[in-house]
Amino acid sequence: VALTEGLIVFPIMVLAISLCVEFGYMMYQWNLAAKAMQLGVRKLVVSEPVTPDFNTVFAFDDTQSGQLIDADASVQSTCGAGTGIACDAAMMTRLISGNLTGGQRWPGLANYFPGITAGQIRIIYELSGLGYQGRPGGPVVTVRMEIGRDAIDFPVIGRLLESIGIAFPPFTVTATSEDLRSCPGPCS
């Protein structure tokens, strides 16, 4: 009788323990993604824009010099995943890999969330309604960064139950731009 009970309970216990471990792993991955996104958007608000049409979309109107800029979320400059517009490759490499050379040392997104690629990131700049026409530091925009991944795979439970994993939720982090410059003075 004891052997029969053991044969029934043992697989259930292994499954329950595996589920707890893999759920913890899933939460760990979500936390890594959230931290990477926080770092990424923070870097974007103090760096040169990565979208190719930023200067065209947010060009100042010289006839309205000194006038306040209206908030208009429909005025956007977007690049990255799902947009069909490629972000600046050098800036994206720097954002993902970081810059650990010279006097500038900061980690990239991959240091916090290994496996992240430029193809999973979407970056959106939109008018925030702050600032004025002709502002020396450029327009004040809202910077939004999103990451999209397919699913989180469960190594043990996924194979046992033949599941495809749990969909990774889209992470969106938003911040208001500061100076949108990567270096002091003119960048070369």
Language-model-derived ranges and their functions:
Residues 22-34, 49:
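Membrane-proximal amphipathic alpha-helices
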